Amino acid sequence: MIIVTFFWVGIVLSAIWTFYKVVLYPYRVSPLRTLPQSQRGHWLWNHAFSEFLQPIGQLHAELLLQIPNDGMICLRGLFGAPKIFLTSPKSLADVLVHRADDFEKLPGERKILRAVVGDGLVTAEGDVHYQQKRKLLAGFTPPKIRALYPVFWKEATALTQQIRRTLTHDGSGIYTGTTDMVYWAPRVSMDMIGAAGFGQSFHSLRDADSEIIHCYEKAFAIGAGHLLCVFADTLLPRIILQWLPWPRWRQFRQNIDSIRDFCHQWVTDAKATTALGDGIPNNLLANMIHTGEYTFQELIEQVRTFLAAGHENTSSVVMWVMLALASDSQLQSRLRQELQANLPEVELDEVDLAILEQLPLLNAVVSEAIRLFPPLPIGNRIAIRDTTVMNHPIPKGTPFLIVPRAINRSSELWGPDADRFNADRWINPDTGRFNNHGGASSNYSFLSFFHGPHNCIGQNFARAELRTVVAAVIRSFDMVLDNPAADVSPVGWFTPRPADGVKVKLRSLV
């Protein structure tokens, strides 16, 4: 009888606690209850899975337009759990800069990233992150980046040469044909990060069967089934997964392990080269080894991180910028004129390629592509202690959504043409010079590289890569879309790409 009584008391207390946590606290007690709320969620799970809806970030861009707010919108998840969508420069500045120590990436997100891209700078938090970034910054100074332009240009030129080999020669010196830039973008970005990052020649452009490219294509595949593999690999014990009849997971795991093996070999090679004492090679890995501050395993994890970030992110933007240029013949012509005037064909090897940083339209095109198509369209943070955002109390454990795709396309921040590719927004009409704000009133309107202590350490590296690829391709070919009606909606869980690819008709120029 006593056991039965305790049982029913437990049931009643559990029901009361559940009612308080699910119904009473979120909507009647929580300090977040006064924030603007979205009513568009699913009847059962509300917005719990909003960050996975394709195109990623599009829903949040719509909510930003539809819900009046002062910088924060409260989205509800399972059982009414709050998730705060940051919508203004002021709220973003608080979370990313002013109170950055009060926020971290979600533990689950860090665990997934650690499994996929390594336990390096991207997954580090707190003092560990500070120390890692302090040591790495020396390899990303402007002089270091400028010294890499010849490396980038060599790979960008190799791209144009390999594309030309796939075209048809008409007998008059002109090559024409059709190609898909979605095929070439990951290959040129892989060869660039290989050479400039690790001193390795991957030859991904020349080798259609490049093993490292195939590993990455499969490890970062598009589709819900692949995403399930990532979650399972992160959340379930390996011993359980090994017993399951799940070939897709085994293939995913094999690709991740192969990438780690590649990184292990590159670090081994780089340490052997450095030990010869013939000077420090001009690449990121050699610089890290030269400091003497990294263990062998730490080097492997940082290489995994830079390989993923330097390859996937750049590859994504290359696809989108080629799509934008192929869609606008006038912009393409203007850019070509600028390049021809500043990069003469004769004795190009003797030109200081850092001049690319001074070309207004080239930099405008690159910045606009990064703005409109951020390689990381959405991110998460969680409050690790009670804090405030815009003077509003935030309880410990509150998750936040940071959505570059939505902020970068906000008409309130970027004007009525925020959704349109407009490179001229980055050029001052009175002087014709490049500006670094694109007409936005706050630098927090541009979120592609985030801000604060956790901003992207490789943003100038990525811009240099993009300048050289765009310059090399536009100097070499005239491009038009093969099918202007193709579906160019962004798809993908990690770095979005056009759904139907970027198929272009090419005509050689040089």
Swiss-Prot record:
It is found in: Membrane. Its main location: membrane. Pathway: Secondary metabolite biosynthesis. Heme binds at C456. It is an enzyme of class 1 (oxidoreductase). It is a single-pass membrane protein. Cytochrome P450 monooxygenase; part of the gene cluster that mediates the biosynthesis of the indole diterpenes penitrems. The geranylgeranyl diphosphate (GGPP) synthase ptmG catalyzes the first step in penitrem biosynthesis via conversion of farnesyl pyrophosphate and isopentyl pyrophosphate into geranylgeranyl pyrophosphate (GGPP). Condensation of indole-3-glycerol phosphate with GGPP by the prenyl transferase ptmC then forms 3-geranylgeranylindole (3-GGI). GO terms for cellular component: membrane. The chain crosses the membrane at residues 2-22. Pfam families: p450. This is Cytochrome P450 monooxygenase ptmK. Signal peptide: none annotated. One of its GO terms (biological process) is mycotoxin biosynthetic process. GO terms for molecular function: heme binding; iron ion binding; monooxygenase activity; oxidoreductase activity, acting on paired donors, with incorporation or reduction of molecular oxygen. It comes from Penicillium ochrochloron. The gene is ptmK. Its cofactor is heme. PANTHER family: CYTOCHROME P450, CYTOCHROME P450 12A4, MITOCHONDRIAL-RELATED. The keyword Iron applies.
